[in-house]
């Protein structure tokens, strides 16, 4: 698949790109694509938040997050949508994401489940 992406002029969507890949192979695949591909586009989803540590690899407009709104509809927004006071060039995007500054984090609620007062 990588040779197809590098040689061709295509867009390929891949859901959960890191699935069944060693983390080093995942990073190697992305870097190989970014360095060698001139005309193709890779659109990938991931739950691998550690990828946010690689600020040197991705531009802010190439990282997108999803959030569920009150109507349970999925909203999509880019890292580049954030004000510079939230994300600066020197800030750690991974840490900003982990503490909830960027959204896209599930609302887990409490660990305790009260089965007696269940609605």
Functional labels for PLM-detected ranges:
Residues 19-23:
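Conserved D-loop-proximal element of ABC-family nucleotide-binding domains
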Residues 28-119:
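C-terminal lobe/lid and adjacent interdomain/linker elements of RecA-like ASCE P-loop ATPase modules
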Residues 14-16, 45-46:
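Short His-Asn-centered micro-motif
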Residues 1-14, 24-28:
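GG-anchored amphipathic helix commonly corresponding to the ABC/SMC/Rad50 NBD signature/C-loop
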